[in-house]
Curated annotation (Swiss-Prot):
Keywords: Cytoplasm, Membrane, Metal-binding, Nucleus, Ubl conjugation, Ubl conjugation pathway, Zinc. The lineage of its organism: Eukaryota, Metazoa, Chordata, Craniata, Vertebrata. It comes from Bos taurus (Bovine). (S)-thalidomide binds at residues 380, 382, 388. This is Protein cereblon. Belongs to the CRBN family.
Length: 444
């Protein structure tokens, strides 16, 4: 077991430390480092989930007495503001995604205090090369909850922020106090017209009906009427040389429905009213919960159209069905079929441990090729009521995530896995058509 002062151990632990074992229990600890293959004997998914899915999104481990702010700060499209950069944040933030932080350095604490007095906005850079700190794109983040406290005489700032707008990096300068200032260009969202707008007479627009999708299908009349509307939606395609299915490939409503079918496989109790109805917000919501690496995520962040972003996300969800260890690249950890949602924001969200490391954690029912390190601990658990145990790759021993086990017998699920996105590599399984996964091109 790594020492408490080991920075690598600090990144993987959720609590301040793992319980130290007496000398006579060292053999027992060795027994706990077993491959978790016994999960295959259990059913894939429990029938009932009685865990309060609002708890992970509230980030109660940061404290319940945080000062909350209201209002939003939005910059004009194509404007070029200068925004301070938080150097500790190393993740590709998606607009609408929540970012929890714990900051300890005096430089960062002072910076956040100044932000609170101004517009509460800072820049999160999407590093294409983390080692060389290279970034061409990023996202603005706005602080909406804030708390200061002292831990053993050290000032600590706890923050909850949310991603707002995409930007392109124009220039980065470092001030005399060490704070980086980024001059950025706010990227606009390109809103495309309806696929049928080119062949429809504008003079008849006042006669057309633009209905909203029924929330419930219990009413048979609403269901039948909606089916008729869907059939007639692309009726004008008969006036063109292209079939109607081609137009549906670029229709926002159709793309959103196809993605929702995929999301229901992750969450059988998914309520459509909990998802954004706007295609732009919906596309960002999906991007934030996709277990993809930074390369693919930056590609999604660069896309300026919700239609194109939705098409790419649907392509990724259909093709990248296997998740492997990023270090080994061939050791399969889990598959898309094992993903499920234990949070209101979806199957994946960002969490921060007491040492300030941010982990985007994906919840899955089953995982393979993993060893457990240490014993379960409830310290600083991101899922209240569950104890966590560090999980490493069986082949290369790199950190993959944690196994969560319920502390009470009446909780469901009794156990699940939380896998950190940075340790996963989405892959395309081999097909019978002898097409190499390397040759399969995603819709990017």
């Amino acid at each position: 077991m790594a020492g408490e002062g080991d920075p690598e151990d600090a990144a993987h632990n959720m609590g301040n430390h793992l319980p130290l074992l007496p000398a006579e229990e060292e053999e027992e600890d060795e027994i706990e480092m077993e491959v978790e293959d016994q999960d295959n004997k259990e059913p894939k998914k429990p029938n009932i989930i009685n865990f309060d899915t609002s708890l992970p999104t509230s980030h109660t481990y940061l404290g319940s007495d945080m000062e909350e702010f209201h209002g939003r700060t939005l910059h004009d499209d194509d404007s070029c503001p200068v925004i301070p950069v938080l150097p500790q944040v190393v993740m590709t933030l998606i607009p609408g995604q929540t970012l929890p932080l714990q900051l300890f350095s005096p430089q960062e604490v002072s910076m956040v205090r100044n932000l609170i007095q101004k517009d509460r906005t800072f820049a999160v850079l999407a590093y294409s090369n983390v080692q060389e700190r290279e970034a061409q794109f990023g996202t603005t983040a706005e602080i909406y909850a804030y708390r200061e406290e002292q831990d053993f005489g050290i000032e600590v700032v706890k923050v909850k922020a949310i991603g707002r707008q995409r930007f392109k990096v124009l220039e980065i300068r470092t001030q005399s106090d060490g704070i980086q200032q980024a001059k950025v260009q706010i990227l606009p969202e390109c809103v495309l017209p309806s696929t049928m707008s080119a062949v429809q007479l504008e003079s008849l627009n006042k006669c057309r009906i633009f209905p909203s999708k029924p929330v419930s299908w219990e009413d048979q009349c609403s269901y039948k009427w909606w089916q008729k509307y869907q059939k007639r939606k692309f009726h004008c395609a008969n006036l063109t040389s292209w079939p109607r299915w081609l137009y549906s490939l670029y229709d926002a409503e159709t793309l959103m429905d196809r993605i929702k079918k995929q999301l229901r496989e992750w969450d059988e109790n998914l309520k459509e009213d909990s998802l954004p109805s706007n295609p732009i917000d919906f596309s960002y919501r999906v991007a934030a919960c996709l277990p993809i690496d930074d390369v693919l995520r930056i590609q999604l962040l660069k896309i300026g159209s919700a239609i194109q972003r939705l098409r790419c996300e649907l392509d990724i969800m259909n093709k990248c069905t296997s998740l492997c260890c990023k270090q080994c690249q061939e050791t399969e950890i889990t598959t898309k079929n094992e993903i499920f949602s234990l949070s209101l924001c979806g199957p994946m969200a960002a969490y921060v441990n007491p040492h300030g490391y941010v982990h985007e954690t994906l919840t899955v029912y089953k995982a393979s090729n993993l060893n457990l390190i240490g014993r379960p601990s409830t310290d600083h658990s991101w899922f209240p009521g569950y104890a966590w145990t560090i999980a490493q790759c069986r082949i290369c021993a790199s950190h993959i995530g944690w196994k969560f086990t319920a502390t009470k017998k009446d909780m469901s699920p009794q156990k699940f896995w939380g896998l950190t996105r940075s340790a996963l590599l989405p892959t395309i399984p081999d097909t019978e058509d002898d097409i190499s996964p390397d040759k399969v091109i995603l819709c990017l």
